[in-house]
A protein has these predicted regions:
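C-terminal GPI-anchoring signal of eukaryotic secretory precursors
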Residues: 55-59, 409-445
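Histidine/acidic-residue-rich catalytic or RNA/ligand-binding cores of hydrolases
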Residues: 337-346
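Active-site region of glycoside hydrolase catalytic domains
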Residues: 133, 163-338, 357, 365-388, ...
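Cleavable C-terminal sorting propeptides in eukaryotic secreted/cell-surface proteins
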Residues: 434-464
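Boundary/entry segment of secreted carbohydrate-active catalytic domains
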Residues: 62-118
């Protein structure tokens, strides 16, 4: 197997120069490589102690089997993410409310190895933006709710923010969108609500004045609870108490060409009423579907029904039909408290895997079948410092050490499946294009597997 130079860089990041030297020797033909250096007494003693703690040879065998399982999980996750992100509609939320996350440079390497090409932050962390320079990954960065009133009151505040958080990083880092506030209209801070649109306008003007040479969209993320009604989707409508805020925001989106962002979690609906919400309907699993009497359309999953309810609400509020909807957050927790039914790794794998299959296939909603759904999955890592119920700390696809929380199957058993991103992204084009896709995917998977192998070795043997 050809080992890309990036693999050595990745290994060096995690384990140091000695590990790179050892790997270089291990992949040489035996006739070319030097003989294996003797293992010192201290390392031998340390290894014997580890074997004793694990129960001798049986324990070592258990470690090997555990390592094989983790590598299998890593392979499935890598294939899933590479396959989906190749369609340019898959993004991931990179939250950092944790004390055990890897350095941004390591995250950049990890996401590149998985083929993720869109990332959404909840701030404008300079370490992250610097680490992702020249990677080609598109970033959505954020203005915090605490800054809205200052920006609404003074255009200079918005200019200073752009000068500090955007200009130093472009064009090396691709910043494609700025979200101004998060779920502001769902709170009770009327001053922040009144400041939201003026702050959005100020940031948009500041970006234009900065002369960046590239378009940067301005939007704000809203919870789906800004809707007064969401089912049937055709009856979607915004809450009356928010109408005075929402209509001008929709006009802003129509004027600037930016999307309306919505955070939508079918898990919350299922958690609130497990007896009234079909779990297969929430998880994109086979189910009879639900017919919308207003349009005659049938919905086989809750997320797409929620998206179409937002479209209907926008139309009812006088919004233009050309304003798009982006799902800025969605996901499913792998763990929860006793009063959080459905929060399991199995359900999380089903939700995210089935969603990614549809995204990779370019599937639209029943109301807008020709418009692929733009999605940011929540989240990249489990975040151990998030407040609230256990589920809040367990939305991650990955543990902080980079190992998968669960096996994620965004593909399928073969090319016959209608929503099979592995075959869609790799084999649906011409033969020459497919060959390029296979080479690209193989390299990405190798890098991802290498990272996982490093993590496993560090856990098991402390060689690095």
């Amino acid at each position: 197997m050809h080992v890309n130079a990036s693999a050595f860089i990745l290994l060096k990041i995690c384990c140091g120069d000695g590990a790179v030297t050892g790997m270089e020797q291990s992949i040489k033909p035996r006739s070319e490589g030097a003989s294996r250096p003797p293992v010192g007494p201290e390392r031998q003693n340390r290894q014997r102690r580890k074997e004793k703690d694990m129960g001798g040879e049986a324990g070592m065998g258990l470690r090997v089997r555990a390592s094989s399982l983790l590598l299998s999980l890593a392979l499935q996750l890598a294939v899933a993410l590479v396959s989906v992100s190749a369609q340019h509609k898959f993004g991931i939320n990179y939250g950092q409310i944790a004390n055990d996350l890897p350095e941004p440079a390591q995250v950049a390497t990890l996401l590149q190895s998985m083929g993720v090409n869109k990332v959404k932050l909840y701030d404008a962390d300079p370490r992250v933006l610097t680490a992702f320079a020249s990677t080609g990954v598109g970033f959505t960065i954020a203005v915090g709710n605490e800054d809205l009133q200052a920006m609404a009151a003074s255009p200079d505040a918005a200019r200073r923010w752009v000068a500090a958080n955007v200009q130093p990083y472009v064009p090396a880092t691709r910043i494609t969108c700025v979200t101004v506030g998060n779920e502001v209209l769902s709170g009770n801070d009327t001053a922040a609500m009144a400041s939201l649109l003026p702050a959005m306008r100020a940031v948009h003007a500041a970006l234009g004045d900065a002369g960046l040479g590239q378009p940067v969209a301005v939007s704000s993320a809203h919870s789906v609870d800004v809707l007064a009604t969401s089912f049937p989707p055709s009856s979607g409508a915004f809450r009356e108490d928010l109408a005075g805020y929402v209509r001008p925001i929709l006009d802003f989106h129509a004027q600037t060409g930016s999307p309306f962002l919505v955070n939508a979690y079918p898990f919350f609906s299922y958690k609130a009423s497990p007896g009234g919400v079909s779990l297969p309907y929430a998880l994109f699993q086979p189910n009879p579907g639900v017919r919308d009497p207003g349009t005659g359309l049938t919905y086989d999953n809750m997320l797409y029904a929620q998206v179409d309810a937002v479209y209907a609400a926008m139309q009812a509020a006088g919004g233009r039909a050309d304003v798009g909807v982006t799902v800025s957050e969605t996901g499913w927790p792998s763990r929860g408290d006793d009063d959080e039914p459905g929060a399991t790794a199995q359900n999380a794998a089903a939700y995210n895997g089935n969603l990614m299959r549809r995204v990779a296939a370019g599937q639209g909603t029943p109301l807008r079948p020709a418009v692929p759904v733009d999605v940011y999955v929540f989240a990249l890592f489990n975040e151990d410092l998030k407040p609230g119920p256990t589920s809040e700390r367990n939305y991650g696809l990955l543990y902080p050490d980079g190992s998968p929380v669960y096996a994620l199957d965004a593909g399928g058993p073969g090319p016959g499946g209608s929503l099979n991103p592995y075959y869609t992204s790799m084999f649906s084009s011409s033969s020459s294009g497919s060959a390029v896709g296979v080479t690209f995917l193989t390299e990405k998977v190798v890098l991802s597997l290498l990272l996982q192998a490093i993590v496993i070795l560090r856990r098991s043997y402390s060689y690095c």
